[in-house]
Regions:
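Conserved mixed alpha/beta catalytic, RNA-binding, or beta-rich assembly cores of soluble enzyme
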Residues: 46-107
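Phosphate-backbone binding interfaces of nucleic-acid-interacting proteins
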Residues: 84-91, 99-103, 108-164
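C-terminal amphipathic alpha-helical interaction region
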Residues: 1-73, 116, 134-164
């Protein structure tokens, strides 16, 4: 799992206005700004099956998907901050790869990458070579991966009984 963090800060980007041949530096105050919501810590306790309930991912998250050429991209957004640690624990690259093995080139040996997007309560997955060529080059029912997010929302996730 990798994190995606925007690296450019407003104070590090020179801002100029160009009028004809002249350039004018512009100073922009860089105080305040977006403060992302806190994210719940990873669960540390090991729960027994009697202490958990298994629910479909759709109870805990939203999803959206699409194509990047022959690759499928799936974004998963937790409905509440306290759900995110359970999403991270359940939706490993291996779990998502196995779940989508029927569409991945190489089956269960196919390649899936995962990124966390701090402050957005979300995960992003890239399923390599999952679209049979993608777009007009594919003979699949969903050549642009638009259904993949909806398919993933059926994935079973175990959570503590009191969480929901």
């Amino acid at each position: 799992t990798r994190e995606y963090l925007p690296t450019a800060q407003l104070t590090q980007v020179p801002i100029e206005v160009v009028v004809g041949e002249q350039r004018f530096a512009v100073s922009v105050p860089a105080s305040g700004g977006f403060v992302p919501p806190g994210e719940a810590a990873e669960p540390t306790e090991q729960l027994t099956p009697s202490e958990t309930v298994t629910v479909p991912l759709i109870r805990l998250a939203l999803a959206r998907s699409g194509d990047k050429g022959d690759h499928a991209n799936i974004g998963v957004i937790a409905r509440k901050p306290e759900y995110l640690p359970y999403l991270r624990a359940a939706l490993t690259t291996e779990a998502v790869r196995d779940y989508f093995a029927h569409v991945l080139a190489g089956g269960s040996a196919g390649k899936v990458e995962r990124w966390t997007l701090p402050g957005t309560l979300s995960l992003n997955f890239l399923l390599h070579h999952a679209l049979g060529g993608g777009g007009a080059g594919s003979l699949r029912t969903d050549p642009q991966g638009k259904y993949f997010g909806q398919m993933l929302l059926d994935y079973p996730v175990a959570v503590p009984r009191g969480l929901l």
